[in-house]
UniProtKB/Swiss-Prot annotation:
UniProt protein name: Transcription antitermination protein NusB
Family from the record: Belongs to the NusB family.
CDD domains assigned to the protein according to its UniProt record, in alphabetical order: Terminator_NusB (cd00619)
Taxonomic source organism: Helicobacter pylori (strain G27)
UniProt cross-references to HAMAP family, sorted A to Z: NusB (MF_00073)
InterPro entries, per database record: NusB-like_sf, NusB_fam, NusB_RsmB_TIM44
Primary gene name: nusB
C-alpha cells in the first residue's frame, strides 16, 4: 500500500505533466495513480490534492508569487512550480500541519529537482505558511 509521501510524489508528477502542456492528464490521472500502486484511501487523497490544485491554480500562483522575492514565477522550472503548487495548496486549503507539508515538499525537491531546490522550496513555503498563519484563507 502506498504512503501519503508516495501519493504526493505521484501528484507532483501529474502536476509536472500538466505544467508541461499535457492537459489530457486530467482525464487519466486516476488510472496513472493506480499504475503507481496508489489505491484506496491514498488514491482519494492524491486525487483530492491534484484536483484541488487544478481548481485553484490561479489563486495558488497568486499566493506563491509575493514570496519569490527576486524570482519571476513564470521563469521557475516546471518541477519547482509543481512542488510549490502542491505545498501552497496543502498549506492554504487542507488541515495537514504546515511543518509536515513543508518537509514533504523539501523531500520531493530532493527527489525530483536540482540540488539547491529544497532550500528554495523551504524558504518560499515557510514564508507562505507564516503569512497564512497571520491571515488564514478560510
Amino acid at each position: 500500500m502506498a504512503t501519503r509521501t508516495q501519493a504526493r510524489g505521484a501528484v507532483v508528477e501529474l502536476l509536472y505533466a500538466f505544467e508541461s502542456g499535457n492537459e489530457e492528464i486530467k482525464k487519466i490521472a486516476s488510472s496513472m495513480l493506480e499504475e503507481k500502486k496508489i489505491k484506496n484511501n491514498q488514491l482519494a487523497f492524491a486525487l483530492s490534492l491534484f484536483n484541488g490544485v487544478l481548481e485553484r491554480i490561479n489563486e495558488i500562483d497568486a499566493l506563491i508569487e509575493p514570496h519569490l522575492k527576486d524570482w519571476d514565477f513564470k521563469r521557475l522550472g516546471s518541477m519547482e512550480k509543481a512542488i510549490l503548487r502542491l505545498g501552497a495548496y496543502e498549506i492554504g486549503f487542507t488541515p495537514t500541519q504546515n511543518p509536515i507539508i513543508i518537509n514533504e515538499c523539501i523531500e520531493l525537491g530532493k527527489l525530483y529537482a536540482e540540488p539547491n531546490t529544497p532550500k528554495f522550496l523551504n524558504a518560499i513555503l515557510d514564508s507562505l505558511s507564516k503569512k497564512l498563519a497571520q491571515k488564514p484563507l478560510n
